[in-house]
Amino acid sequence: MAKNISTKQLSVLEYIYKTVNAQGYPPTVREIGSAIGLSSTSTVHGHIDRLQKNGFLEKDPTKPRALEVTKLGLDALGVQDKNPTIPLLGVVTAGEPILAVEEATDFFPVPPEYENDSSNLFMLTIRGESMINAGILSGDQVIVRKQSTADNGTIVIAMTDENEATCKRFYRESDHIRLQPENDTMAPIILDNVTILGKVVGLFRDNIY
C-alpha cells in the first residue's frame, strides 16, 4: 500500500477515479459514503481532505465537486497515467555551473518515442550559449533521462561537488573529468569529481521561426 494512505482512503480514491472515468465528473460526498459503507458525510470529507493534503487528489477551487486523481494517486491505485508528463525542474546553465533546482515548475507532454520511459525523464531550461554547436540554444528545454553513468562524448547534466549543475559533453580522462562545451570560444571545465544526473536525449524549443 502507498505511504500515507489508509485502506478506507484507498477505497475513496478508487471510487472517485472509477466514477470520473465512467461519467466524466466526480461523485457526491453522499455517493462516496454509500459506495464504501460510510454513513457520515463528515467522515467522507475527512478522507477527501487527507487525500488532498497527501497529494493523492487535487481540487479545483473554482469549480464545485471538481476532484482529480493525481499521478501519485494513480500510482497508489496501480493505474498507469494515460497522459504522462515530464516535469520541468527549473534552469540549468550551458555556461558556468549554477545551483540546481529540484522542484517542478511546469509539466510537458511526453513525446511518443519516450512514453515507455516517462518515469525516468525530467526537463531543464538551458541558459547560456556554451552548447550552441550541438544545437542546444539558450531558452531551450532539454529532455533528460535519469542515469548516473555516461559514455565519453555524451551530453549530460552534471552536478559538481558544490551542488551546481551544468549541461556539457562528458569525458572521463586519466586523472580528471572534462566537461566540454560545444562552443569554440569557451574553455572546458576540469574537475576531480562530478555526479551525473542524466543524459540529454531531446529538447523542446518554443521560438522556432
Curated annotation (Swiss-Prot):
Does the record bear DNA-binding in its keywords? yes
**Positions of the site: Cleavage?**
A94, G95
Top enzyme category = hydrolase
- Catalytic positions are S130, K168
Q: Which UniProt keywords apply?
A: Autocatalytic cleavage, DNA damage, DNA repair, DNA replication, DNA-binding, Hydrolase, Repressor, SOS response, Transcription, Transcription regulation
Q: Which cysteine pairs are covalently linked by disulfides here?
A: none
Q: Which GO terms describe its molecular function?
A: DNA binding; serine-type endopeptidase activity
Give the CDD domains listed for this entry.
S24_LexA-like
Which reactions is this enzyme annotated as catalysing?
Answer: Hydrolysis of Ala-|-Gly bond in repressor LexA
- GO terms for biological process, alphabetical: DNA repair; DNA replication; negative regulation of DNA-templated transcription; proteolysis; SOS response
Q: What is its EC number?
A: 3.4.21.88
What the entry lists under SUPFAM superfamilies is as follows:
LexA/Signal peptidase (SSF51306), Winged helix' DNA-binding domain (SSF46785)
**Record function comment:** Represses a number of genes involved in the response to DNA damage (SOS response), including recA and lexA. In the presence of single-stranded DNA, RecA interacts with LexA causing an autocatalytic cleavage which disrupts the DNA-binding part of LexA, leading to derepression of the SOS regulon and eventually DNA repair.
**Subunit-structure text:** Homodimer.
Kindly give the NCBIfam families that the UniProt entry links to this protein. Answer: lexA
The family annotation for this protein states: Belongs to the peptidase S24 family.
Task: Quote the protein name from its UniProt record.
Answer: LexA repressor
Species this chain originates from = Pediococcus pentosaceus (strain ATCC 25745 / CCUG 21536 / LMG 10740 / 183-1w)
Name of the gene encoding the protein in the UniProt record: lexA
